[in-house]
C-alpha cells in the first residue's frame, strides 16, 4: 500500500478502470479515471487519439469514469460524429469522434458546466462518472452526488440538453414535483439534498 499522503493527496492509486468501451465502426472509445478519453483501433489495439482533461486532481476524492456515449448530428453540422464524456470536475464534453478535438458550438468551448444552478459545495460533492443517454434528440445527464456528508448537498436533478448546441432543454428536479420543469435561469438553484442517480 502507498502512504496515506500518496493515497489521499497525490491520487497515485487512482488507476482502476470502471469504463465499458463502446464500439463504433472500427474504433473503440473509452475513458480513464482521470477523465482522459481514448479512441482505439478495434483490430490492432493501437491508440488513434487521446483527449486529456486538464482539470486539477486536488480536492477530488473519487476519480472514475464509467464510459462515453456516441451521437451523430444532422448532416452539415460541424463535428457531426460526437463522443460525449463526463469529467470528474462536473462537465460534459463533446469531442470529435474522428480527431478527439472539442466540438465548437457545443456549450462553451465544447463543454457544458454541470455545476450551473447547483449552488456552492466542495468539488468532490458533485462529479460526473457515467455516460449520458442520447435519446429522442436529447442528451440526458445524471450525476454522482456524494451521500451522507452534509444536509445541504447538491441537487440530484436530471437534466436534458441539446446534443448539438449544449443548450438546456428540461430538468427533472425531485424537489419540484413529479414532472420535468424548464431549465433554471438567473441565480436560481435546483432543490438541494434530493436523491440522485449516482451517475
Task: For the regions a language model picked out, list residue spans one by one.
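Short, ordered coil/turn segments that flank beta-strands lining enzyme active or ligand-binding pockets
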Residues: 43, 88-90, 97-98, 108, ...
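Aromatic (tryptophan-biased) beta-strands that constitute blades/sheets of beta-rich domains
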Residues: 1-16, 46-55, 101-121, 167-174, ...
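N-terminal amphipathic, basic-rich helices that act as targeting or association modules
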Residues: 24, 40, 160-161, 168
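A short, polar/proline- and glycine-enriched secondary-structure boundary/capping micro-motif
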Residues: 41, 50, 61, 151-153, ...
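Solvent-exposed loop/turn segments at secondary-structure junctions
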Residues: 35-36, 56-57, 90-91, 113, ...
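Repeat-blade elements of multi-bladed beta-propeller folds
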Residues: 14-34, 61-91, 124-150, 157, ...
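Beta-propeller blade signature
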Residues: 95, 99-100, 154-167
Amino acid at each position: 500500500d502507498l502512504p496515506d499522503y500518496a493515497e489521499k493527496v497525490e491520487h497515485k492509486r487512482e488507476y482502476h478502470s470502471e469504463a465499458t468501451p463502446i464500439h463504433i465502426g472500427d474504433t473503440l472509445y473509452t475513458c480513464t479515471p482521470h477523465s482522459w478519453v481514448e479512441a482505439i483501433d478495434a483490430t490492432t489495439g493501437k491508440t488513434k487519439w487521446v483527449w486529456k482533461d486538464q482539470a486539477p486532481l486536488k480536492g477530488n476524492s473519487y476519480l472514475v469514469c464509467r464510459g462515453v456515449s456516441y451521437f451523430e448530428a444532422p448532416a452539415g453540422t460541424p463535428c457531426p460524429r460526437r463522443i460525449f464524456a463526463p469529467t470528474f470536475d462536473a462537465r460534459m464534453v463533446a469531442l470529435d469522434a474522428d480527431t478527439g478535438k472539442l466540438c465548437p458550438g457545443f456549450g462553451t468551448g465544447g463543454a457544458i458546466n454541470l455545476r450551473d444552478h447547483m449552488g456552492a459545495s466542495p468539488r468532490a460533492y458533485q462529479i460526473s462518472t457515467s455516460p449520458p443517454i442520447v435519446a429522442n434528440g436529447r442528451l440526458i445527464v445524471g450525476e454522482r452526488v456524494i451521500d451522507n456528508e452534509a444536509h445541504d448537498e447538491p441537487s440530484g436533478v436530471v437534466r436534458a440538453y441539446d446534443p448539438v448546441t449544449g443548450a438546456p432543454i428540461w430538468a427533472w428536479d425531485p424537489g419540484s414535483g413529479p414532472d420535468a420543469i424548464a431549465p433554471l435561469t438567473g441565480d436560481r438553484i435546483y432543490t438541494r439534498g434530493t436523491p440522485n442517480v449516482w451517475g
